[in-house]
Design a protein with these regions (language model features):
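Conserved active-site tyrosine of GNAT-family acetyltransferases
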Residues: 17-22, 96, 125
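N-terminal amphipathic/basic helix or basic patch
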Residues: 2, 9-16
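Ligand-binding pocket scaffold of soluble enzyme catalytic domains
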Residues: 129
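Conserved beta-strand-loop-alpha-helix junction that forms the acyl-donor binding cleft
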Residues: 11-14, 87, 111-112
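Short Gly/charged-rich anion-binding patches and loops
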Residues: 16-17, 91
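Vicinal oxygen chelate
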Residues: 1-6, 28-84, 91-121, 133-142
Length: 142
């Protein structure tokens, strides 16, 4: 059985944050223009991240989870690091610079993976790490 997490973070402006993530990750939106909830997905449809407006949601406004509706009680970035692995690291770094992202760490290999990564902040203050994909060696078929 296939299981995948759908990470949801609360944001101030779903439309603006959707644009920010789709640009950085060269991804697509599942609900373009949505103001309460959107999904950022890869070209194969895999959901990478869900964005939820800071506030209650649902058809009747009864989805009122404190972690998504009480912004005043905690800082958005507290306890969260969004980590993405990309197949074209250099292009992602170039996009981050072109879009004027706040850079927290320039590309380095001091992240515990031995692979290059950089860290930027999104418009809501979340730290976003972008890591190059690790090439897996082919098994020895002797």
């Amino acid at each position: 059985m296939l299981k995948r997490p759908w990470h949801i973070v609360a944001v101030t402006d779903v439309v603006a944050s959707s644009g920010w993530y789709t640009t950085l990750l060269e991804a697509q939106q599942n609900h373009p223009g949505a103001r309460v909830f959107n999904q950022i997905s890869d070209s194969d449809g895999t959901v990478l991240l869900c964005l939820h407006w800071w506030g209650p949601s649902g058809p009747h406004g009864d989805h009122d989870w404190p972690s998504l509706s009480q912004k005043q009680k905690r800082h958005a970035a507290c306890g969260v690091l969004l980590w993405f692995v990309v197949d074209d690291f250099d292009a992602a770094w170039e996009r981050a610079q072109k879009m004027g992202a706040t850079i927290h760490e320039v590309p380095n290999t001091n992240n515990g993976t031995g692979m290059r990564s950089f860290v930027v902040q999104d418009p809501d203050g979340y730290f976003v790490a972008v890591n190059e994909i690790r090439e897996v060696a082919a098994p020895n078929n002797l």
